[in-house]
Amino acid sequence: MHIYVDETKQRDYLLVASVHVSTDLTALRQTVRGLLLPGQRYLHMKDEKDGRKRTIAQAFVDAGVQATVYRAGSHHRNERQRRSACLEALVQDHAALTEARIILDEDETMVKFDNQKLIEYTRAAGCRDTLRYEHKQSHAEALLAVPDAIAWCWAKGGPWRTLIGPAVTAIRDV
């Protein structure tokens, strides 16, 4: 099981985790590569025009991707607390898997913090040896485009949320 994770801080703090079985990864990577424009290294929704955003979101829905949206409210005092609460819920939700890999979109300012929290949460959940994690940059891992697109659409709301809705299987308020 592979879990790709990205966030958005637009409006609420959202962390989106798209879950994929290993056998689906090649086909999904081909879908992402097929969406790239000539010379484009990776997909990032905030950089795309609306027509492309619709195409990208619809392609992921059509591919059958499934994701959980973790939403941290304002009762958390700051962004780190919100991120921490989302990461803890993410680990709890996947602790029972016999083997899983979490790939987080790399934000250099958060890597050390994430690693400390993930060590703490995987130990507490008893899954330190079965739930692995790493940070990657978007251009190095094409499938980080999936949670990026879902997070962007969900945060925008309205017709964007409706469009991406079939890909969202759960919403967790933390």
Give, region by region, the residue ranges found by the protein language model:
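Phosphate-ester processing/binding pockets and catalytic centers
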Residues: 1-174
